[in-house]
């Protein structure tokens, strides 16, 4: 892609998200979503192929439907309240429709159907943008309207997202699909605590973006898209591969890695709010997500086939293109759990 066009598209994506996050006018928020959607589609088709065309079409149809529902909710709220700005007296019907529209844009279950297919059909860089940056705009709107969201609807979608995110990733061999299902599960964790403690949602989102960005950067460094290809990188780049596996375990929420921190704090907060059954269900379903990451780690590191001795030192002569910020991302993605006591005391 031409660098000038790439810069223009990226700037439009950022601008659309910033408009959504900073506006208090419903029409401006809708326009920001539309700018973001129309700008991301050329990014999805950056590597032209039938799969990328199919992925971009699925993304467009889903986001267009969500935008239509969002506009319907805005109009209903306008008729009820008589104003275009945020109001705490939102019509219950408009609130439900808007929650469904934002869930479709985020990929929450049961509106998750497009996330794995679209992520699988695009490049790693586009997948990184789709699973991180594209979550900011709808989640920011949910954050603002959280006091008036239907609690039962949001918690139902959260539990379904955690369950489907763990269940769907069990039989996957494509790394992009695994990360897509992991994204669905993480969105479920974020929305489950949104009404009770919105600041904890922001903490979870920050750590999720950090870990996902690091994982995608490592995959781009090794040009890896399948579990088989990941296992073959062990002899060539053992340090990069071991770092990838540790960060994926962190994404699964294995203590003492940093991915355990948001799950721990969310379950603690739900318990404080007397949601014992919900916290128990989330803890049990989180094991599904951790299981397929542990299975991937086991298959990659502990089931290596016998190799010749001269292959063991191949990594010493392999000059791979390194990213300067990669070591810092790896450290932040795995070793920030000691911040937990300070966060709990501040909370």
Curated annotation (Swiss-Prot):
EC number(s) stated in the UniProt entry for this protein: 7.1.1.2
Transmembrane domains' residue ranges: 13-33, 59-79, 96-116, 122-142, 144-164, 178-200, 210-232, 246-266, 276-296, 326-346
Key words, A-Z: Electron transport, Membrane, Mitochondrion, Mitochondrion inner membrane, NAD, Respiratory chain, Translocase, Transmembrane, Transmembrane helix, Transport, Ubiquinone
Localization: Mitochondrion inner membrane
GO molecular function: NADH dehydrogenase (ubiquinone) activity
Main enzyme class: translocase
Superkingdom of the source species: Eukaryota
Entry's family note: Belongs to the complex I subunit 2 family.
Protein name: NADH-ubiquinone oxidoreductase chain 2
Species this chain originates from: Rhynchonycteris naso
């Amino acid at each position: 892609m031409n660098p000038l066009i790439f810069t223009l598209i990226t700037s439009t994506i950022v601008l659309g998200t910033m408009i959504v996050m900073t506006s208090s006018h419903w029409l401006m928020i809708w326009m920001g979503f539309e700018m973001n959607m129309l700008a991301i589609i050329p990014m999805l088709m950056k590597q032209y192929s039938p799969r990328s065309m199919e992925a971009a079409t699925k993304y467009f149809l889903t986001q267009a439907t969500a935008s239509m529902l969002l506009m319907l909710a805005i109009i209903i709220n306008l008729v009820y309240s008589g104003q275009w700005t945020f109001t705490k007296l939102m019509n219950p019907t408009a609130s439900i429709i808007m929650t469904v529209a934002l869930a479709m844009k985020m990929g929450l279950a049961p509106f998750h159907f497009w996330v794995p297919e679209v992520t699988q059909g695009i490049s790693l860089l586009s997948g990184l943008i789709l699973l991180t940056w594209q979550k900011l705009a709808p989640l920011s709107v949910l954050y603002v309207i959280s006091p008036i969201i239907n609690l039962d609807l949001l918690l139902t979608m959260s539990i379904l997202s955690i369950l489907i995110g763990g269940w769907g990733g069990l039989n996957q061999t494509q790394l992009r699909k695994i990360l897509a299902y992991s994204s669905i599960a993480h969105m479920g964790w974020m929305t489950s605590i949104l009404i009770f403690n919105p600041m904890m949602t922001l903490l979870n989102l920050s750590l999720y973006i950090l870990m996902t960005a690091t994982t995608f950067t490592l995959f781009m460094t090794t040009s890896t898209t399948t579990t088989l290809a990941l296992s073959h990188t062990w002899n060539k780049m053992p340090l990069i591969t071991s770092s990838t596996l540790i960060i994926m375990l962190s994404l699964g929420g294995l203590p003492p890695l940093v991915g355990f921190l948001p799950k721990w704090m969310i379950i603690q907060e739900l318990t404080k709010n007397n949601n014992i059954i919900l916290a128990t269900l989330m803890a049990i379903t989180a094991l599904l997500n951790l299981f397929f990451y542990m299975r991937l780690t086991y298959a990659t590191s502990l089931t290596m086939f016998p190799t010749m001795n001269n292959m063991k030192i191949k990594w010493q002569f392999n000059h791979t293109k390194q990213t300067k910020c990669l070591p810092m991302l790896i450290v932040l993605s795995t070793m920030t759990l000691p911040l937990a006591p300070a966060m709990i005391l501040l909370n």
